[in-house]
């Protein structure tokens, strides 16, 4: 049995196909691929579903600043900076939410108008190749320029803004001709200008100039100075004028000063209690005596007259 060949005996360039030689690691390693970074204006912003989370954070920080009056200065500054950052993040999230809504709303209109502009542009190119007269060539070039702007209008119209249709819907011939000959939307001129400057991508992803915000503006609470609590002063007690009690006994002096005699009150209370008990007992006994008198029958006794 023949021994196995060593790896050093084999010729690597002959074993590997030339088209795959780049994939084989050798003395010269394969250069790493560089990641393409998106432009700053084309990066996707915060997702629309994070709006509620950001609003909750803003509410928490606002309540903290309103209620905690004795916060240290450094903590208050950090909270105010965080609040400003969350407000900016909320504005970006709401703008992205509006952008997604507009894309979904005008997707079909943009698609059909883009297809229509592409078909018309192909027809004009064929006519341009077949035409021979100079005047017709110039006219076709002007029409091609208009259709190229129309095509770019359907592709690079700002996604966050309301899309205005270029072509009239199907209807009567006169209405279609009138609508076709009317002026282009105001955005059409901007698209034409951006074609010359080469800034169509920036136009497509630009933010709307004035967006209607659904959230109320958050105001920072004003810091109130904590005043020390004042201790109320005791009211002066008015003293009654002195009464001359010479020649009076103790009970008279107490009556003069307005002090109730507890002993007399107790006796009166006991008297009233005893009187009510005696009265109830007398009523019961009287009723019994009346019953006995009514039921007494003479039996011819000794004491009867």
Curated annotation (Swiss-Prot):
Pfam families documented for this protein: Efg1 (PF10153)
Residue ranges the record marks as coiled coil: 49-155
Annotated localization: Nucleus, Nucleolus
Composition bias type Basic and acidic residues, residue spans: 199-209
Keyword field contains Transmembrane helix: no
Cellular component aspect of the GO annotation: nucleolus; preribosome, small subunit precursor
Region (Disordered) location: 1-52, 199-305
Disulfide bonds: none
Keyword tags: Coiled coil, Nucleus, rRNA processing
Sequence ranges of Polar residues compositional bias: 270-279
GO BP term (any one): maturation of SSU-rRNA from tricistronic rRNA transcript (SSU-rRNA, 5.8S rRNA, LSU-rRNA)
Described function: Involved in rRNA processing.
Family (UniProt): Belongs to the EFG1 family.
Descriptive protein name: rRNA-processing protein efg1
Organism field: Botryotinia fuckeliana (strain B05.10) (Noble rot fungus)
